[in-house]
UniProtKB/Swiss-Prot annotation:
Catalytic activity: UDP-N-acetyl-alpha-D-muramoyl-L-alanine + D-glutamate + ATP = UDP-N-acetyl-alpha-D-muramoyl-L-alanyl-D-glutamate + ADP + phosphate + H(+)
Pathway it works in: Cell wall biogenesis; peptidoglycan biosynthesis
Keyword Phosphoprotein: no
Source superkingdom: Bacteria
Gene that produces this protein: murD
Matches recorded under InterPro entries: Mur-like_cat_sf, Mur_ligase_C, Mur_ligase_C_dom_sf, Mur_ligase_cen, MurD
Protein name: UDP-N-acetylmuramoylalanine--D-glutamate ligase
One GO molecular-function entry: ATP binding
Record family assignment: Belongs to the MurCDEF family.
Role description: Cell wall formation. Catalyzes the addition of glutamate to the nucleotide precursor UDP-N-acetylmuramoyl-L-alanine (UMA).
PANTHER family reported for this sequence: UDP-N-ACETYLMURAMOYLALANINE--D-GLUTAMATE LIGASE
Any one Pfam family match given in the protein's UniProt record, by short name: Mur_ligase_C
Length: 438
């Protein structure tokens, strides 16, 4: 255990993660200072009264007086106040670094532009099916530090690029970068390679690296090495194969599971399952338990979720598709008898939308574009696009047009914060309207 007594610690950002950092440090004899750029951040009412706090801005002098800053992933390291503190020699870390210094059980670490929550939950359920005591959290569910409160045989962490930027001591038993596509480009002014560099930190000191055989950007900096196990739809140690008209999940040439046995739809979920199997095998989870867990896995809300079906029309909520790569994954292998009604829109985070263009061709695709970057998305295929201000307006138009055999897909390729408080609310609005107009 690291001794933090004597450190002058500042925590930036409250919420569940910030509170977990406060609790972690107080139990180790340190009362940190807390600051948040919001005047009423979530969790403020739970902050102990004796903890000094500064709200509404970053307190630059507190940062310069600190010996250790534990910052929220939401605050970029390029923020002038943080950059000044770093230049003055103040150590800057995040909650995952605090966790990594303390965790005694093996850690499986999962990142990627898309699919990381699904794979994290799959691996967690595989371990649970084997009877292991497992803690699942990080960028999903519980903050990582909260997981230390219960005895665990395995930790399964979803990690974002922002979290990895401030993590230096993680030694994962198995780690994966599922895929890399443009996301958060407003946070990475140097472009995709800067974003990738943050993701690849997950491999530092990892015992096993699970890489995407069809995405070279997921390879470690030095390329494919002895630590690497690969997965992919068409190739890899874990891949898909057609046999007798059915798709099978394979491991090194051995058939493991027929795709039709999975309860989650979409080709992208087959590859998510392959990545989870590669990780579980690397961790020594018994194969029978892993396969049983996959057969029972029902998927996560707002992730390619069938929320309504009536009169031959399916309505799928993929609101978590907050970037182009995630929407491409949803469209890949999608089978539609009639017309695909695709809802796109929101805050594109300075992303390039043009990779979507090949998926939008043909007379059986209709686009409905809304929100901050709706016009830019509509320009990808103007002859098939309907531009509206809001998701609700688009849904009511769709409701008047759909016919049996059609599929309505909300897979926005954009963040939700221009019009919604989060992607969950956006998905809930879609679901409510689907049941109303469908």
């Amino acid at each position: 255990m690291t001794d933090y007594r004597g450190e002058q610690v500042v925590i930036i950002g409250l919420g569940l993660t910030g509170l977990s950092c406060v609790d972690f440090l107080r139990r180790r004899g340190v009362t940190p200072r807390v600051m948040d750029t919001r005047f009423t951040p979530p969790g403020l009412e739970k902050l102990p009264a004796d903890v000094p706090r500064h709200l509404g801005s970053l307190h630059e002098q507190w940062l310069l007086d600190a010996t250790l800053i534990v910052t929220s992933p939401g605050v970029p390291l390029s923020h002038p106040a943080l950059a000044e503190a770093a230049a003055a020699g103040v150590a800057i870390i995040g909650d995952i670094e605090l966790f990594a210094r303390e965790a005694s059980a093996p850690v499986v670490a999962i990142t990627g532009s898309n699919g990381k929550s699904t794979v994290t939950c799959m691996v967690g359920e595989m371990a649970a099916a084997a009877g292991w005591q497992v803690g699942v959290g990080g960028n999903i569910g519980l903050p990582a530090l909260t997981l230390l409160d219960s005895p665990c045989q395995l930790y399964v962490l979803e990690l974002s690029s922002f979290q990895l930027e401030t993590t230096h001591s993680l030694k994962a038993a198995a780690a994966t970068v599922l895929n890399i596509s443009e996301d958060h480009m407003n946070r990475y002014p140097l472009g995709l390679q800067q974003y990738r560099a943050a993701k690849l930190k997950i491999y530092h000191d990892a015992a096993v690296c699970v890489v995407n055989a069809e995405d070279a950007l997921t390879l470690p900096v030095r390329g494919h090495d002895a630590r690497c196990i690969s997965f992919g739809a068409e190739r890899g140690d874990y891949c898909l194969r057609r046999h007798a008209g059915q798709t099978w999940l394979m491991a090194r040439g051995e058939p493991l599971l027929e795709g039709a046995e999975l309860r989650v739809g979409g080709r992208h979920n087959y590859t998510n399952a392959l990545a989870a199997l590669a990780l579980s095998d690397a961790l020594g989870i018994p194969s029978a338990a892993s396969l049983a867990a996959l057969r029972q896995f029902r998927g996560l809300t707002h992730r390619f979720e069938l929320v309504h079906e009536r009169r031959g029309v399916r309505w799928i909520n993929d609101s978590k598709a907050t970037n182009v790569g995630s929407t491409e994954a949803a469209l890949n292998g999608l089978e539609v008898v009639g017309t695909l009604h695709l809802l796109l829109g929101g805050d594109g985070k300075s992303a390039d939308f043009t990779p979507l263009t090949p998926w939008l061709q043909g007379d059986r695709v209709q686009l409905y574009c809304f929100g901050q970057d709706g016009a830019q998305l509509a320009s990808l295929c103007p002859e098939a696009a309907t531009l509206t201000e809001t998701l609700e307006q688009a849904m009511r138009i769709i409701g008047s047009r759909v016919r049996a055999g059609d599929l309505v897909l909300l897979s926005p390729a954009s963040a939700s914060l221009d019009q919604f408080s989060n992607f969950e609310v956006r998905g809930d609005v879609f679901t409510r309207l689907a049941r109303e107009v469908g």
